[in-house]
Regions:
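Acetyl-CoA-dependent GNAT
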Residues: 2-84, 90-99, 103, 151-159
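Conserved catalytic-core motifs of GNAT/GCN5-like acyltransferases
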Residues: 35, 109-111, 129-146
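Conserved active-site tyrosine of GNAT-family acetyltransferases
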Residues: 123, 128
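Residue-level recognition of the GNAT/N-acetyltransferase active site
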Residues: 80, 84, 113-115, 140
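Short glycine/proline-centered loop/turn elements that form peptide/ligand docking sites
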Residues: 89, 93, 115-119, 136-141
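Well-formed, non-transmembrane alpha-helical positions, independent of function
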Residues: 19, 121-122
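Conserved GNAT acetyl-CoA-binding A-motif
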Residues: 100-111, 122, 134
Length: 160
């Protein structure tokens, strides 16, 4: 498998959603329920849900979030545990940054548990800077959130 054979693209259909839910279940103590994603997918003008697709159509990771006032607010970026440590999280992030820039969005925002060193390293390595913190934002366990952002360069859509 080469980087060229891996794609980041919009979620397509129930099979992709099943894969996203499986990644959620493998990654988080409290995964997001199917009904939430089903509702969000009814708002394509606002909701962003992109998948990291390996050859053979296997979904190995995803990113979800919302467009708001020229920003992309990321709620989740996750790679299935079987595929971690291979650079796929960075690929998913880089492709999403490029997509958001082509869409004319100005910033990407997100928050991360203070103890999530791997995620903080990923985002800081991609040019995100800390702009704040949210005290006791997370529960189970209670923990602060680090708020990060990255400004996006304008990159017009091809053919626009």
């Amino acid at each position: 498998m080469t980087p060229e054979t891996v794609r980041v693209e919009a979620l397509e259909g129930a099979g992709d959603l099943d894969a996203v839910l499986a990644i959620e279940a493998a990654s988080f103590a409290h995964p997001t329920p199917r009904a939430f994603y089903e509702r969000e997918l009814l708002r394509p003008d606002v909701t962003v849900l992109r998948v990291l697709r390996l050859p053979g159509c296997a979904v190995a990771g995803f990113v979800s979030g919302w467009r708001a006032a020229g920003d992309l607010e990321i709620s989740t970026l996750a790679v299935h545990p079987d595929w971690r440590g291979r650079g796929w999280g960075r690929r998913l992030l880089d492709d999403t940054l490029a997509w958001a820039s082509r869409e004319g969005l100005q910033r990407m925002l997100l928050d991360v548990r203070r103890s999530n060193d791997a995620a903080l390293a990923l985002y800081r390595g991609a040019g995100f800077v800390q702009t704040g913190e949210r005290r006791r934002y997370y529960s189970d366990p209670v923990e602060d959130a680090v708020v990060l952002e990255r400004r996006l360069p304008f990159s017009p859509k091809i053919g626009a």
